[in-house]
Amino acid sequence: MSEAAETLDGWYSLHLFYAVDWTTFRLIAEDDREAMITELETFVKDKAVARESHQGDHAIYNITGQKADLLLWFLRPEMKELNQIENEFNKLRIADYLIPTYSYVSVIELSNYLAGKSDEDPYENPHVKARLYPELPHSEYICFYPMDKRRNETYNWYMLPIEDRKTLMYNHGMIGRKYAGKIKQFITGSVGFDDYEWGVTLFSNDVLQFKKIVYEMRFDETTARYGEFGSFYIGHILNIEDFKQFFSI
């Protein structure tokens, strides 16, 4: 049997995607719409306390295209906290006019493919802790997509010897390092949590960098032979002070 890679796991992750029911929302009286927006602002401000106490974080983006209008991404120490957040959000008045289009449940993950041998507790390493329990950037743009490692009769990632997988992931990682300073990447593991095996969330102030890195990685053997992808979601940051303009009709 092929050897499984060990993982380090951090905060639990929930991506929520919604479309706005503009047809119905425009029928609501202006005062009621404003009250809904104020309630949403209060909800988001309340969730920002977790960032300040380093007990989680969140990001909100306006999705481009017809797959969704909004992305809300939450990180928390325990899965049940994500349930509480989702339940609380669904009880907001404005949620009556938001149509769920997609969601993704996962956990911030680092694999040991590129790790060197050490007796150190990795969870005490400041660099590792910063990646497992991150402070999300407030970049202009976001890109999210789920992915699997291919497993069929011709190419089966999980049947490769671990040394071969380490080599492939090293070469794969070298491409990503070329985009340091341009893209911030977060990998979340979802085996047993959702329909794909990983979620990839990218942040950048230059949206074109998403196209460049994904295209370049298409030529990497790890992706070309073993990568399978779901839908891609691209969005622009939606700050709390932008809510009124976004929901105005």
UniProtKB/Swiss-Prot annotation:
Required cofactor names: Fe-coproporphyrin III
E.C. designation(s): 1.3.98.5
MF (Gene Ontology): heme binding; metal ion binding; oxidoreductase activity, acting on the CH-CH group of donors, oxygen as acceptor; peroxidase activity
Superkingdom to which the source organism belongs: Bacteria
Keyword annotations from UniProtKB, A to Z: Heme, Heme biosynthesis, Iron, Metal-binding, Oxidoreductase
Pathway per the UniProt entry: Porphyrin-containing compound metabolism; protoheme biosynthesis
Cofactor stoichiometry and binding remark: Fe-coproporphyrin III acts both as a substrate and a redox cofactor.
InterPro entries assigned: CHDC (IPR031332), ChdC/CLD (IPR010644), Dimeric_a/b-barrel (IPR011008)
Database matches in Pfam families: Chlor_dismutase
GO biological process: heme B biosynthetic process
Enzyme class: oxidoreductase
Active-site residues from the entry: 145
Known catalytic reactions: Fe-coproporphyrin III + 2 H2O2 + 2 H(+) = heme b + 2 CO2 + 4 H2O; Fe-coproporphyrin III + H2O2 + H(+) = harderoheme III + CO2 + 2 H2O; harderoheme III + H2O2 + H(+) = heme b + CO2 + 2 H2O
Classification via PANTHER family: COPROHEME DECARBOXYLASE, HEME-DEPENDENT PEROXIDASE YWFI-RELATED
Family note: Belongs to the ChdC family. Type 1 subfamily.
Purpose: Involved in coproporphyrin-dependent heme b biosynthesis. Catalyzes the decarboxylation of Fe-coproporphyrin III (coproheme) to heme b (protoheme IX), the last step of the pathway. The reaction occurs in a stepwise manner with a three-propionate intermediate.
HAMAP family attached to this UniProt entry: Coproheme_decarbox_1
UniProt name for this protein: Coproheme decarboxylase
Taxonomic lineage from the root: Bacteria, Bacillati, Bacillota, Bacilli, Bacillales
The gene coding this protein: chdC
